């Protein structure tokens, strides 16, 4: 690789990334080698390892012209950093950079990356606007070359009336016959998002096939980060609407939603049957899935949202992380999520308390910590609310509060230590079970991931609470009977 822009990024990250100790990072969540991370990209299994690229600015802990960071793992928990994969260094992407995309394997064994290439273009009125096109890069899992044919998709490939300013985030895969398919999002003529399908025989020469789904100003405005995949006999179109209005389980702003339905491969027709929110917490966006060698559909996401990216720990050396990857399944027409089973393999010391009666705030021996896998089951009781406090000390805590009368679960990090005027509290409905509730909670220093009732609902949030705040307590307004099981993690 001879390009100076890429070599500069690689030299910088090698020097400064190595200066960040493991103790300064989460234990099992991917963070940038150095600097800034947002959307996970190119999540794939290639040459015996999981690859996770990511939107990346190595030079600062804030967004800037986008590179692609790169890490690999054999177990989705321990990540090895590889050198920066892409930099904004070609005529197609030398403006704001190499935006989000994906990866697949070619017939000759090379890896094909497809990404949104962005350049600034002067408009007839003199205004400079970013033009979004799709480009490719081909490599061996370490080094990637951008062919001279870039970009491979432009506005001319879109239906009439679709915007060249909002055309991005290709998710690529191979069909059974070897055809390359990719779904992108674009802004339709009505000013709201659409998901468009493109195909290619060789990965270089692409053509428009159809519009799979339209927003019609019903689910936010512009869409981002689409994915399209089969799951348990259904077809799923997953994406991130921007500027959502609150309705039902959806909240204001950025969401991740899944359209679940059927797909006719002969006519390329997707028929929607159900729509659901993928996470009811505070920090969850930019999902992407891959198919594991054993057939599992595994999802990653950015453990962040755009509205709170300015709330950073003072002096931080990195910013942004991805979730613990999740396995997806469909039950009763809805997607269930569970932490990847690889997490079970690192379970260490087990602490177990059974049939504990909880009234006033109570701590249980051995149940504490900031890196743990905790399952709490509220079995029964007469109570008006049940409260679980995490990452707690005299001044800090993040709470989960369950109201059995409304079946509402609330995640609240108002006292986690942030001084920012941002969203700190969200609620979601869980299935009513006469007061019973099961919560699996993943703690990893700066984050909390909650799986309610075996992943029927999830809630995710970052917390920048001092690591010394490691208390966990239980309380009920009334009387609740609980079981708690915690595993330390050997990482």
Language-model region placement:
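Beta-rich carbohydrate-recognition and catalytic domains
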Residues: 1-169, 174-218, 230-279, 303-353, ...
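Beta-rich accessory regions
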Residues: 10-15, 257-491
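Juxtamembrane/interface motifs at transmembrane-helix termini
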Residues: 229-230, 479
